[in-house]
Regions:
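Histidine- and aromatic-rich ligand-binding microenvironments
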Residues: 5-6, 37, 99-101, 122
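Acidic, PIN/NYN-like endoribonuclease modules and their adjacent C-terminal/linker elements
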Residues: 1, 108-138
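Short, well-structured N-terminal submotif of metal-dependent ribonuclease cores
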Residues: 1-36, 49-66
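Active-site neighborhoods of divalent-metal-dependent phosphate/nucleic-acid chemistry enzymes
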Residues: 46-52, 70-118
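Generic structural signal for small/hydrophobic residues in well-ordered secondary structure
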Residues: 6-7, 22, 44, 87, ...
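Residues that scaffold the ATP/ADP-binding catalytic core of kinase and kinase-like folds
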Residues: 12-13, 25, 47, 87, ...
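Short secondary-structure boundary/capping segments
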Residues: 1, 25-28, 67-68, 76, ...
């Protein structure tokens, strides 16, 4: 099985006290089976830009620009035609009760297009037909 990591999973790895269950799960899965979306990088960058402490901000920028590319390498997935079409389909069938953000539906579409299991803390954010979801925090 291959996995698409949500932003909250990637961000957990840089926290001062990361969740032990997430750490254990990540250590048990070969890194070649872990993928992220370009949108995850964008969400992380957006969060970093809001930080006012320049030392922390610079530390996180270094992590984003150097460590994450080393960790994921070629496993950073772009938005291609198949993902875009699946996203269009998903947004057309999901009702107002789902309240999924554009980024969450793009991540779901990416996971479906690449046959990946979505890994997130926010299971309810990925209530999408056909999408397998895993919460390593539990």
């Amino acid at each position: 099985m291959k996995y698409l990591l949500d932003t909250n999973i990637v961000s957990e790895t840089i926290r001062p006290y990361p969740n032990k269950n997430v750490q254990q799960w990540l250590s048990e899965v070969p890194s070649g089976l872990l993928f992220i979306s370009v949108f995850t990088l964008g969400e992380i960058r957006r969060g970093i830009e809001k930080i006012t402490d320049s030392k922390r901000k610079n530390h996180l920028l270094l992590w984003l620009e150097q460590e994450l590319p080393n960790w994921f390498g070629e496993n950073v997935l772009p938005i291609n035609q198949e993902v875009a079409e699946r996203w269009g389909y998903l947004t057309s069938i999901l009702t107002q009760q789902h309240q999924l953000t554009a980024i969450d539906t793009l991540l779901a579409a990416t996971a479906l297009a690449h046959n990946l299991k979505m890994v997130t803390r926010n299971i309810k954010d990925f209530d999408v037909p056909g999408l397998e979801v895993l919460n390593p925090f539990d």
